[in-house]
């Protein structure tokens, strides 16, 4: 919150490769491309692997400081390699386990409030009205994002999409 990095004269390019992320067993192979240019903090063209099932690509992302709060805004593209293991890990009901290859969405994460909102969600290059309504309702909710709320979100997401 000090805005130390928000300096018009500061330019940094960092590429960070992390094989294993400690205390988060499921995430590995993190590649983080951090660019600070004239005070803008960008984290684009980065990715992380969830087990060997998903590749989560972070695109067009920007960290900004606005009215005393820090936000990460961007686009995520999730490439799904193994749906079965993913569904098992999140204990998705078997009747809601169908093949999907890709999920794309925009997001805005408020670090100060630990809240996230989603927009423009596309599954296998198609929009779904039921999912749009689900996302809009989720965004109106004031719950803090944590492991439990995330798991519940994922379960409800697939229940609505394939239900």
Regions found by a protein language model. Give the residues of each.
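Membrane-proximal interfacial segments on either side of biological membranes
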Residues: 1-163
